[in-house]
Every structure is written in structure tokens, then in C-alpha cells.
Amino acid sequence: NLAQFGFMIRCANGGSRSALDYADYGC
């Protein structure tokens, strides 16, 4: 869905995210 797509974009672009954030976003 759109929310998941947004999370993928954030995962691709955000270098400051923690490992837990990546796991939550499904990346």
C-alpha cells in the first residue's frame, strides 16, 4: 500500500535510520 511504499523510499534514502527502523519498514 502507499504507506509501505513511503517507508521503502525512506529506507532507500535515509542513512540515519536504525536497524530496527529498517526491520519495521520491511526493507
From Swiss-Prot:
Where does the record say this protein resides?
Secreted
Say if the entry is tagged with keyword Glycoprotein: no
Catalytic activities = a 1,2-diacyl-sn-glycero-3-phosphocholine + H2O = a 1-acyl-sn-glycero-3-phosphocholine + a fatty acid + H(+)
Q: In which tissues is it expressed?
A: Expressed by the venom gland.
The cellular component terms of Gene Ontology attached to this UniProt record, alphabetical and capped at eight, are: extracellular region
Q: Which residues form a coiled coil?
A: none
**Is Metal-binding one of the keywords?**
yes
What InterPro entries does the record point to?
Answer: PLipase_A2_dom_sf
Tell me how the cofactor is bound: Binds 1 Ca(2+) ion.
Q: Where is the signal peptide?
A: none
Q: Which GO terms describe its molecular function?
A: metal ion binding; phospholipase A2 activity; potassium channel regulator activity; toxin activity
Needs which cofactor?
Ca(2+)
PTM annotation: Contains 7 disulfide bonds.
Keywords attached to this Swiss-Prot or TrEMBL record, sorted alphabetically, are: Calcium, Calcium-activated potassium channel impairing toxin, Disulfide bond, Hydrolase, Ion channel impairing toxin, Lipid degradation, Lipid metabolism, Metal-binding, Neurotoxin, Potassium channel impairing toxin, Secreted, Toxin
Q: What is its EC number?
A: 3.1.1.4
Q: Name one GO biological process term.
A: lipid catabolic process
Assembly and oligomerization: Heterotrimer composed of an alpha-neurotoxin-like peptide of 8 kDa (AC P0CJ35), this neurotoxic phospholipase of 16 kDa and a serine protease inhibitor of 7 kDa (AC B7S4N9) at an approximate stoichiometry of 1:1:4; non-covalently linked.
Family to which this protein belongs? Belongs to the phospholipase A2 family. Group I subfamily.
Function, in words? Heterotrimer: blocks the voltage-dependent L-type calcium channels from the heart, and the small conductance calcium-activated potassium channels in the chromaffin cells and in the brain. Is very toxic to mice.
User: What's this protein's name?
Assistant: Phospholipase A2 taicatoxin
